[in-house]
Amino acid sequence: MLGVLLVLIWSGSGSALGQINPDESSEETPSNPTEEIPASESEPEEPVSPSEKEPKRRVFKRIGPQPMTPEQREEAERLRKVAAKYGTDPTAIVGRVQLTSQYLDLTPHANATLSTVRVDLPFRSDYLLRMDVPFLRTTDAQNPGMGSQRGLSDFAVTAAWRAYNTPEYALLIGAVSTFPTASEPALGFGKYTVGPAIATARFLPRLESFLIGLLQYQTSVGGDPSRKDVSFFSVTAQVNSFWAQRWWTIVQSVWHVDFERSGKSSMVMEFEGGRNLIGRFGAYIRPGVGIYGRDVTGAYIWNIEVGVRYMFTSF
């Protein structure tokens, strides 16, 4: 059941590590017509197509922060405020009280239900403290002697700092720690874990959406020596869009690598649809499906999550 525990850990305090400015177009130096050219070099060279000239430079132009018009910057700032109000921007420094419940179909014989209370406390507009209190129930039909186990899982704390913030691009850096507070051995790692987390959000003017990246590494640093060590890396890529007056959607893929299992990996795809109900109250539903690697950490056959949240401003 260790795969279930990955959903307890915040997968991004906040995915590019810095801002890449668009490259200026280079001017080619014209050849001197009076310069003598040896006969062996007099054959004209084949022209280089624009698509082959500077492919790497064009890639960086597309993935890095782009220059925007004043109207686009104004729209980016407006949508950043909307995303913060709805609780969908992982780089926003806003308060949160959130309740979620998730059902995971892990294998043909095992499933789990995870309920989490999350509280975010913002400080001085650039700092955030997050606390997650999870409750887990697991069932494994192939191990009837264990039966169904339920209770408190591992408590998680995240401390984060927003290192960069503009209307079109933001970067959050944090550290995530978990503590072996599980009421039953099967409900937690049995280890203290710690690791860095990074979150970025970039405005996409053409889509009027945000491209969000989350990266996290987690490793065990102590705890029960008889329990298996923890060492995994996760990457999340998502597109956050807004519709009509109060609706939002998120399409995301999550890739996990478990280094304690020789680097085996898994991937899931999830879709979230949510609505702002009234004021700063919102609700969402998020189904997901496993793509590959169902027998490794962080994987499932399918899942569905529902949640409600209340967002509040910084202190």
Where are the language model's segments positioned?
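Sec/Tat signal peptide C-region and signal peptidase I cleavage site
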Residues: S13-G18
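Bacterial N-terminal signal peptides
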Residues: L2-G12
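Transmembrane beta-barrel domains of Gram-negative outer membranes and organellar outer membranes
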Residues: I20-F315
